[in-house]
Design a protein with these regions (language model features):
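Short, low-to-moderate order helix/coil transition modules at the start of elongated helical scaffolds
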Residues: 1-245, 250-252
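Conserved beta-strand/loop scaffold segments within soluble protein domains that form the structured core
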Residues: 19, 41, 46-47, 55, ...
């Protein structure tokens, strides 16, 4: 497989973040200087590589295998008030180690490892020096997958979508740690609101343990009610026990001067259900990653993503769902609009692991390109090591034709006004489907900053 050795042009938001596909995977630092015509700023940038990396890399020249973050070392820790928690009653507040303890206990629930298959330990033991040249080599991904399936307990195999380096940064800079432990047959509704603080990192670290047949509705709101620049984000870990249901809604309404980081990891036991809604509307640069381990039979994950890219904004997505249980299901749907000179990378990987008989996975993306200046990259991937499975993937890309723009121009709408129509439609949909009044108000605030008379016409 081709190795990545080039470093393409990077993107930046307030000189704090860049994206490329260089091979670096460990944090490094460099002095911050002038880039892209921006005013010089003193300080040091911390580079975090291997972010939102695809589990099985594709061609390096596509420049979409992974992302690199550059975050200022001078960002202060946001005050605790930057993260508000609503609805977390004492009966649902878990101990600090509740998630780790729950994952450790899964080793007893799932003691078995990979069943016999080509490339397993027994197969490798039969290889002799005389025959090894006749045996097909395994890729880096295949070797890692075999190790995961043969040797790693559920807790060791657990991962988040943005990767280990990004998780370490987010967890290490968490403004507030929230542990939600819903008892068996219980039901809880919890909201976490993260507000941007100028020159600071405001991050909510959330652990969720949903006991057997429990139900949790979790809303996460990332917003910037005051002017400034910095990092706003969340890192979420979910352990869903047998037949538990976890519904996660994350709405991001930051202004362009902010960076948004949203990292999620899921573990599903038998019959568990996790439904995720990502709504990405603002931030000059945003990175969203989600990884799910469907180890229990008949577990199901549903992901719906709505996004908007405008002006010079950058959107970066990575979804990885690993099917290990029998008759597991996943559905990934993404729908977005790109205008101006915005950029977007979408990676969606469904991994049908050996032994997941009867599993089905579907991923779809629909994106409207409203300007010829946008940069759109989409890579839906199906990895398969089982025969009795079904995997479906596809992407639909539409654009506004010149004759349509001419028609609008004849009626007094120039290119910018035409793009505002699509931006308004996406924001109106988000406002109407907001989970509560504060989230709706945040969408309206963002809309008012982008479009004239947004609130008046919405009403």
């Amino acid at each position: 497989m081709k190795q990545e050795t080039n470093t393409p042009n990077a993107f930046t938001s307030s000189e704090l973040l860049q994206c490329d596909v260089s091979g670096a995977t460990s944090p490094t630092t460099r002095t911050k200087g002038t880039r892209g015509g921006s005013e010089p700023r003193d300080g040091v940038l911390q580079e975090i590589g291997g972010v939102n990396a695809m589990p099985a890399a594709t061609w390096g020249w596509l420049k979409m295998n992974q992302t690199k973050l550059e975050l200022s070392d001078e960002l202060a820790a946001a005050p605790a008030e930057a993260v508000e928690v609503e609805g977390l009653d004492e009966q649902f507040a878990g101990s600090a180690d509740a998630f780790d303890a729950a994952m450790d206990a899964m080793a007893e629930r799932f003691p078995e490892r990979r069943t016999a298959a080509p490339g397993d330990a027994a197969d490798r033991a039969r290889i002799t020096p005389e025959t090894e040249l006749n045996v097909p080599a395994t890729s880096v991904y295949q070797a890692g997958a075999i190790k995961l399936e043969e040797e790693l307990a559920p807790a060791e195999a657990f991962e988040t979508g943005m990767g280990e380096a990004a998780y370490t940064y987010l967890a290490g800079h968490a403004t507030k740690r929230i542990v939600i432990d819903v008892p068996a047959y219980g039901r809880a509704t919890v909201t976490a609101r993260v507000s941007g603080v100028d020159a600071a990192a405001a991050i909510a670290a959330i652990d969720v343990v949903a006991r057997p047949q429990a139900t949790l509705d979790l809303q996460i709101a990332l917003d910037s009610p005051v002017a400034g620049e910095g990092v706003v984000g969340s890192v979420l870990r979910v352990c869903a026990h047998e037949y538990a249901t976890v519904n996660v809604t994350c709405t991001q309404t930051l202004d362009d001067s902010w960076i948004a980081l949203d990292d999620t990891g899921l573990f599903l036991d038998e019959g568990a259900r996790v439904n995720v809604q990502h709504t990405v509307l603002g931030a000059g640069a945003s990175a969203t990653g989600l990884a799910g381990d469907l180890l229990g039979d008949t577990a199901k994950v549903t992901i719906d993503t709505d996004y908007l890219g405008a002006r010079e904004q950058v959107r970066d997505f990575n979804y990885e769902l690993r099917h290990r249980g029998r008759k597991t299901e996943c559905e990934i749907d993404a729908n977005g609009v790109l205008t101006g000179t915005s950029k977007k990378v979408y990676r969606g990987t469904i991994d049908l692991v050996h032994g997941c008989k009867g599993a089905t996975g579907t991923e779809r993306e629909t994106v409207l390109l409203a300007n010829k200046g946008v940069d759109n990259k989409t890579v839906p991937v199906i990895l398969c090591d089982e025969d009795d499975v079904a995997g479906n993937h596809g992407a639909t890309i539409g654009h506004v034709r010149d004759e349509q723009l001419f028609y609008l121009a004849c009626r007094g709408l120039d290119q910018n006004a035409a793009e505002d129509l699509f931006i308004r439609a996406k924001l109106e949909d988000a406002a109407l489907s907001a989970t509560d009044e504060r989230t709706r108000a945040a969408v309206v605030r963002l809309g008012n900053n982008l479009i004239d008379n947004f609130e008046e016409e919405l009403a």
